[in-house]
Amino acid sequence: MTRMFAAWLAASLAVTATAGAQELRLTKPAVRLAHQFSGINGFRELSDGRVLVADGIDDVVLRIDLATGKIDTLGRAGPGPGEYKSPDGLFALPNDATLLVDLGNARMSVFDGTGKHRESFPIAQGQPGAGPGPVPLIFPRGTDSRGRIYFQPVGGGGDSGSVVRWDRAAARFDTVAKVKLPPLITRTSGGPNSRNVRQQPPPYPVQDNWAVAPDGRVALIRAPGYRVDWAAAGGRTTGKLIPAPPVPVRAAEKKEFMAESAANGLSVSIENNNGQVSMRFARGRRDDDGDEPDTEGMEWPAAKPPFTGTSAVGPDGRLWVERSVAANAPRSYDLIGPAGDVVGRVVAPVGRRLIGVGAKGAYFRHVDADGISYLERYDVR
């Protein structure tokens, strides 16, 4: 099915200088798509400039030509081959193929450059309850130009985790780096024959973040201080501390955190009912999660961590790191070079948040007052 929607074209940005790094203040997008999304859960730019967008609420993956406004669908909703339910992340593979995270069907699917489904494989690489350790769950965080998948294993506890590179062609897993994890809050309900265990980090957790470059380098964004290290095949580069004024957590920031968690938080549910183990994956708050959490009953930090969990490496090799800002303030991004230094900054218009960086520019999601999402592209070259 093909649909046509208008895209309007304009371009505007303001350039200023800040402490050794050029700052771009984006004002108007080069392209804003008129199509209304219920949500934008996954995004990627194709080699010909078209883009793919996964809307997990509407159960659709759209292929969009921003130059003409032409939109068609990739696959369709359902449980069968080439179908998906609650489509989520989209990642580039060689020959313009795409890896789709299919949360509702608990699997990942590969579509070739023409949009044809090629294969699917499960998110859980093992069976729940089959061994003493946690089930290996693969939620991709990035891919490189060779098609290797990078992920951070879920579960296991402790204050550190691993960045793992999965080379499917060689059937090999390699640990690329170790990262700091926040403590988890565990809640258990039910009886011995029907037990439900839920784990979640505290509000605004202090933890490392990371992103993958097309050439396979991994940017490690370190906490509690703020610096960027690079891990590559030829060695590691340790960056210098980057100044980060504290952002106090007040009532508005608490409300912001709860809203973002309800809309975008990833839930993994493993239930054991009389020996029958099942797993569910979902994005956002589920209907069976119970009453809304009481913000006053939660332990809040005095300030946000220096950076959020949003980061991306563009085709030019620069890392984009989303800085923490006050609630309802414009989002700000540090551009980090190969030595771990800040080489530029970008400030987005209010209500915009980065979803990807490609050869054509930087892509942002705009959510309006009614919760409708729009896709915008800005020229930041």
Model-identified regions with their sequence ranges:
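Eukaryotic scaffold repeat domains enriched in small/polar residues
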Residues: 19-381
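N-terminal secretory signal peptides that target proteins for export/translocation
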Residues: 1-3
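Bacterial N-terminal signal peptides
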Residues: 6-16
